[in-house]
């Protein structure tokens, strides 16, 4: 059985850990609101960008001059998985859930005879995927030094991805990230960004207004499509940022509660052990006095 001193040290250590988890919870809570607002503000812009491009693409359907970012390469053999995760841990299943979704997609594609490559954004995803797919990781972007994510960071990633696409390194690119829903709910999401998936209008949808474009549709698309890749990546990074702080806040709250429960149990064991030792000493003193 541990001595009383060991028990006191253990209780003190648990209390110190509880203070750390509580502080991390408060920091995550303070950063969550701003990250949530940024993610929610980016959604309408990204969705509207998709809608505008879909409208223009419908007008230029079948044009031989259509951008490869829209028309694709005509093949479906090489898939690039753009996996966006966090740079830090202590956030519950936030990172592992994104990696799990990407890994499942990769294995499914490989079982179909497809070639799979990875482009990792974030240290945690890179470290996890490297164990199984090290030779298939073609790029890794580390954002640990970035204090606040801006469009310039997403644009830089988009340029790297598009350059590899233009060089013929892959045919399809799918973006993986965590969509923020609430503090306790973050949804791992996969979104194909190259070639862009243009959804056909529903049968009962209202007729779309006809527009005349200046310059030509293909010229507009050639300018908008690369930017759209950057916009979708930027949205994913913002969603990830909000999801990370939400997951970390929830995880640290659970850790703080668990530490409190451990302290309660450890203190109970300590008090019972101390009481038993005092009782034993009293019995020994009384027995000695009676013997005299």
Swiss-Prot record:
Membrane topology: Peripheral membrane protein
HAMAP family xref list: ATP_synth_gamma_bact
Lineage top rank: taxon: Bacteria
Entry's family note: Belongs to the ATPase gamma chain family.
Job description of the protein: Produces ATP from ADP in the presence of a proton gradient across the membrane. The gamma chain is believed to be important in regulating ATPase activity and the flow of protons through the CF(0) complex.
GO CC annotations, alphabetized: plasma membrane; proton-transporting ATP synthase complex
CDD domains on file: F1-ATPase_gamma
Cross-referenced Gene3D superfamilies: 3.40.1380.10, ATP synthase, gamma subunit, helix hairpin domain (1.10.287.80)
Sorted UniProt keywords: ATP synthesis, Cell inner membrane, Cell membrane, CF(1), Hydrogen ion transport, Ion transport, Membrane, Transport
Compartment(s) of residence: Cell inner membrane
Oligomer and partners: F-type ATPases have 2 components, CF(1) - the catalytic core - and CF(0) - the membrane proton channel. CF(1) has five subunits: alpha(3), beta(3), gamma(1), delta(1), epsilon(1). CF(0) has three main subunits: a, b and c.
Gene Ontology BP annotations: proton motive force-driven plasma membrane ATP synthesis
Organism for this UniProt entry: Bradyrhizobium sp. (strain ORS 278)
GO molecular function terms noted in the UniProt entry: ATP binding; proton-transporting ATP synthase activity, rotational mechanism
Name assigned to this protein: ATP synthase gamma chain
């Amino acid at each position: 059985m541990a001595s009383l001193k060991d028990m006191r040290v253990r209780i003190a250590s648990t209390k110190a850990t509880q203070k750390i988890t509580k502080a991390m919870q408060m920091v995550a809570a303070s950063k969550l609101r701003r990250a949530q607002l940024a993610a929610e503000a980016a959604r309408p812009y990204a969705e509207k960008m998709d809608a505008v491009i879909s409208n223009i693409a419908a007008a230029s359907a079948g044009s031989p001059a259509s951008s490869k970012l829209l028309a694709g390469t005509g093949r479906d053999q090489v898939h690039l998985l753009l996996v966006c995760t966090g740079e830090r841990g202590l956030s519950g299943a936030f990172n592992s859930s994104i990696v799990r979704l990407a890994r499942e997609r990769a294995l499914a594609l490989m079982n179909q005879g497809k070639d799979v490559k990875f482009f990792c954004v974030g240290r945690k995803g890179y470290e996890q995927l490297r164990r199984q797919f090290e030779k298939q990781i073609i790029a890794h972007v580390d954002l640990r030094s970035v204090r606040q994510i801006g469009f310039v960071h997403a644009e830089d990633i988009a340029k790297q991805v598009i350059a590899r696409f233009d060089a013929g390194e892959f045919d399809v690119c799918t973006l993986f990230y965590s969509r923020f829903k609430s503090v306790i709910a973050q949804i791992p999401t996969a979104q194909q960004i190259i070639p862009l998936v243009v959804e056909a209008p529903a049968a009962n949808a209202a007729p779309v207004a006809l527009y005349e474009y200046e310059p030509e549709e293909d010229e507009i698309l050639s300018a908008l499509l690369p930017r759209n890749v950057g916009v979708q990546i930027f949205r994913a990074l913002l969603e990830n940022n909000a999801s990370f702080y939400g997951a970390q806040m929830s995880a640290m709250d659970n850790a703080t509660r668990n530490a409190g429960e451990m302290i309660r149990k450890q203190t109970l064991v300590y008090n019972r052990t101390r009481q038993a030792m005092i009782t034993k000493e009293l019995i020994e003193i009384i027995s000695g006095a009676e013997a005299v």
